[in-house]
């Protein structure tokens, strides 16, 4: 009788009605994928990654020459010396134009080391983004399982309403036959009303859980058209029971690929390049420079002036130059030495951060392992509790139907059965979540 009621409640709950017919059911994988594509924090980290790409391009282009053009115009007024050595009154204009090139030939290997450092910084930013994606995936999975948990609690609440409604009908028949007092009938109706309140609360909990999940996905205006796909668990729990991996084994694997570890590795290597960049200040620097300039001179005002044509002056006044400049550091107020010392201190700090990241990862894996084993034990215990309370409720139901027990005894047995089902449901989804977290540390994507 109980089994048939459970089946009926589950069937009725799963029927699509009203707005649910148009609701799209999202799988966990779809939710995670959508969240990764639309999460604002991830988009900001993607921009940070693009910024590191720009830094790398800037560093690579440091080898290219710097080319600049210049144009000038000067005016002279009043007395000045002529080409014959005489002081005369005249006004003049002088136009100049030129182009200059400067290119580093050797800079103490600063540029190649800076390029290498920027490449490592870019890789570190990619791992930062990957870590954020992992955290978001776990967060979405948590909300998703909360929806499944609340939906199963709704089924349990519906079952309680169905059982109470069935007993109200039977109690009314007993009362009409004069076998029980009216007080028992009202007690049973009160129990039904209480179960209906619990059902309403469970329905609201499902809506709130769906809202939390939709908001975690940055899904706007989801409303009634958002729902989740309930996976077929089947023998999943049995598989999860045997999938708990020892923490040391998980850590040995996780430390080789987890993004938070790889990020610190890249940042440490980048800091080592920073020492080479600072040490470049000890070496001479060789630069190539070249240029071309020309000009036009023009006298104007009163007087007999012989101004050469503009094109002839530009051609005849041209001047070319090329040269090498060598800068040799002798004393720089210990700036280079202190820069190197600061870089070495930064390396030591990065090494400590690397070690701390590994220890934090191991602690997280240990915690995930013990949480999974504790959840496993709780689920096994709750499963036994359901079996026992189910038998007790069946016995109480038979006694009440035979008129050998009161409404309170029946309600107490039914309440204990409902509590055991709720505890089993909570233990089940907590166990699933904990095992998924442990598997995730071991490199297995979160799926259901």
Each language-model region and where it sits:
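Periplasmic alpha-helical coiled-coil/stalk elements that build and connect Gram-negative outer-membrane
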Residues: 135-253, 371, 375, 417
């Amino acid at each position: 009788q109980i089994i048939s009621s459970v089946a009926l409640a589950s069937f009725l709950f799963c029927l699509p009605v009203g707005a649910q017919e148009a609701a799209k059911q999202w799988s966990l994988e779809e939710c995670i994928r959508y969240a990764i594509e639309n999460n604002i924090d991830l988009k900001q980290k993607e921009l940070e990654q693009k910024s590191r790409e720009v830094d790398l391009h800037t560093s690579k282009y440091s080898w290219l020459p710097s080319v600049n053009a210049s144009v000038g115009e000067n005016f002279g007024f009043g007395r000045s010396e002529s080409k014959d050595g005489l002081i005369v009154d005249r006004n003049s204009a002088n136009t100049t134009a030129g182009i200059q090139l400067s290119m580093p030939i050797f800079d103490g290997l600063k540029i190649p080391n800076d390029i290498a450092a920027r490449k490592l910084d870019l890789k570190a930013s990619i791992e930062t983004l990957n870590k954020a994606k992992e955290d978001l995936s776990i967060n979405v999975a948590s909300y998703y399982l909360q929806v499944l948990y609340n939906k199963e609690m709704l089924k349990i609440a519906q079952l309680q309403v169905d059982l109470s409604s069935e007993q109200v009908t039977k109690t009314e028949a007993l009362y009409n036959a004069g076998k029980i007092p009216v007080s028992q009938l009202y007690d049973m109706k009160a129990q039904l009303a209480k179960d209906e309140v619990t059902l309403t609360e469970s329905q609201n909990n499902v809506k709130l859980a769906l809202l939390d999940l939709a908001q975690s996905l940055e899904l706007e205006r989801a409303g009634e058209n958002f729902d989740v796909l309930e996976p077929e668990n089947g023998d999943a729990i049995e598989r999860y029971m045997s999938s708990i991996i020892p923490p040391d084994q998980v850590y040995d694997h996780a430390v080789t690929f987890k993004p938070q570890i790889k990020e610190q590795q890249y940042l440490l290597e980048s800091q080592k390049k920073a020492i080479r960049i600072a040490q470049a200040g000890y070496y001479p620097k060789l630069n190539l420079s070249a240029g071309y300039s020309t000009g036009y001179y023009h006298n104007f005002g009163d007087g007999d002036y012989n101004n050469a044509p503009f094109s002839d002056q530009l051609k005849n006044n041209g001047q070319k130059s090329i040269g090498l400049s060598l800068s040799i550091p002798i004393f720089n107020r210990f700036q280079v030495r202190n820069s190197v010392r600061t870089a070495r201190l930064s390396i030591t700090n990065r090494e400590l951060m690397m070690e701390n990241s590994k220890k934090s990862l191991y602690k997280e894996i240990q915690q995930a392992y013990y949480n999974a084993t504790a959840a496993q034990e709780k689920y096994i215990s709750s499963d036994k509790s359901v079996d026992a309370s189910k038998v007790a409720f069946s016995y109480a139901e038979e006694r009440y139907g035979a008129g050998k027990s009161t409404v309170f005894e029946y309600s107490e047995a039914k309440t204990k059965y409902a509590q055991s089902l709720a505890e089993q449901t909570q233990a089940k989804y907590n166990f699933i979540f904990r095992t998924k977290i442990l598997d995730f540390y071991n490199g297995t994507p979160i799926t259901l």
